[in-house]
């Protein structure tokens, strides 16, 4: 008990540090716009990213002089605080990005303090950063489970809920007021985080701040798993003390369902403890228990969202499905658990008999419809799958056109390399080759048949050369086939995102 109390005091020690003065420090903005720490921001329009030390000094000087740090984005008749409109937008973005770095500091310190030397090395492992690391986990664990909850995590109903949840971790009132000021003054931001687009952050200008807020929201949503795990295993984990701030949720829950103590709620989930995975706004929770247990989980999820986040969740956000009769639509794959029956003949002395073995097998495949739709938007082919030339690329050289189509094919091959059935992937790549041929034939004002006849087999090899070289380094020579194609299953552990696999930049 003394160790638990000491850990709680350690966690609370950084909460009383004042973060607000850091917004007046120059090095904070250096961290915010460093290429290594802010890659997502640098993917946007480079013209608007002209920052310098002189600009930062001017911004800090104006922050000392002005009573307000930011202005309303929708008020056209307001007084100009930072001068020219372009500078106002620049300063506004600099403040928000700097503030995002500031609020990340306490959580980074908490993570570092909670890890020992071995775990720090594991965190730095590039393999664990790959989203493909989820699928080997599914293959190992989901084979022996019965039911799965297909969960769509609800979006925050109101921005004030995010500020209130952050208040339990961050005790600096000035920083919280500044965050609230950012969220409410810039009214056009409110739709960013309370809408469906908040998951991708593809077009959000201040995506780092909103990404932090959404990740913190999801972290709070997942925090009760630790409580249930500790209650189930009867272990006194030190992280349990940091979660005692959520006690007000159970107080609300008591009045809702007339439960006298938390132990009555937690005893529903003692055994068996389920397996949980999440990517972006979708989560899977699978268990070996019965259908009744999964309905209790669903009931707990809905009550948790309503009481803690004041979110009235719709029933269609949680589906209860049986793994043997259901395909999981997760991270661009259709995964399922199927029974493979096999008959084995065994002979002992003069007696022979047949044994029927029915093992479970985890299958995953790339769905053809979403892939076709994602490539139909940038006009690689029609919605019906008919290839059309990429007319905007006709001004490029032949090698650049082939290289762009080849990179798209290789990206798709890398991501869907773990598919059990690659027939759909081969169809997609075949249509991409025809689309590339149409683009080149349109550029040279020729027919597709004549162009393919002139290029020969070299044109097809451009789409598989890099993939074949990579596989030859990690697989024995026996696995190599003609044309560089490998029909086995390989999970690439260097993929950390999926949003740019198709829309090649």
Swiss-Prot record:
This protein's UniProt keywords: Chloroplast, mRNA processing, Plastid, RNA-binding, tRNA processing
UniProt main location, coarse: plastid
Annotated Gene Ontology cellular component terms: chloroplast
Signal peptide coordinates: none
GO molecular function (one): RNA binding
Transmembrane segments: none
KW tRNA processing (keyword) present: yes
Protein localization: Plastid, Chloroplast
Top-level lineage group: Eukaryota
GO biological process: mRNA processing; RNA splicing; tRNA processing
Pfam families for the chain: Intron_maturas2 (PF01348), MatK_N (PF01824)
Keyword NAD carried by entry: no
Family: Belongs to the intron maturase 2 family. MatK subfamily.
Function: Usually encoded in the trnK tRNA gene intron. Probably assists in splicing its own and other chloroplast group II introns.
HAMAP family: MatK
Protein name according to UniProt: Maturase K
Provenance organism: Gomphrena haageana (Haage's globe-amaranth)
Gene responsible for this protein: matK
